[in-house]
A protein has these predicted regions:
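Alpha-helical transmembrane segments of polytopic membrane proteins
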Residues: 50-59, 112-122
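Cytosolic juxtamembrane helix and N-cap/initiation of the first transmembrane helix
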Residues: 1-21, 134-136
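Loop-to-transmembrane helix junctions at the membrane interface
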Residues: 69-87
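Membrane-helix boundary connector in multi-pass membrane proteins
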Residues: 94-114, 133-134
Length: 140
């Protein structure tokens, strides 16, 4: 089991997903805004698209940070930083969605099931690999 839970691999995959997902969100911010907020026009659409653009930048920034820290760290340090960043990211995304949902975000929208399942699975595998390697001896 430990052989498939290689911390570096799963953290890099999760970071790459963040980079690609964030870039996708940035590129299609206006489409996301229309899908999640319903019929908007003019300034409302600009504000909603700006929110989606900012969200994409946040996701991309997380992916870049995780990728860089994965490259710069080893052993238990990598596992501990990786686990911390995954938990922080998942909690912040949950808080963001729940806060916006109370304001009408996503009420009539289609839920992107496949990307959410893939992201959830990658997050779980990356977190599990970090937990398994939490106390690995440091490299000399």
């Amino acid at each position: 089991m430990v052989k498939i839970l290689k911390t570096g691999l799963w953290l890099r995959l999760f970071a790459a997903m963040g980079l690609i997902g964030g870039l996708s969100n940035i590129a299609t911010a206006e489409d996301w805004a229309e899908d999640q907020w319903g019929t908007l026009s003019g300034r409302e659409l600009d504000i909603a698209a700006g929110l989606e653009l900012t969200w994409g930048i946040k996701i991309m920034s997380f992916g870049a940070l995780l990728m860089i820290l994965t490259q710069l760290t080893r052993a238990s340090t990598r596992a501990r930083i990786g686990a911390s960043l995954i938990v922080i990211f998942v909690v912040s995304e949950g808080v963001t969605v729940s806060t916006l949902s109370g304001r009408g975000y996503g009420e009539d929208a289609s839920l992107p099931v496949a990307p959410l399942l893939i992201a959830g699975l990658l997050a779980l595998l990356a977190l599990a690999s970090c937990i398994v390697h939490w106390n690995d001896p440091t490299d000399a």
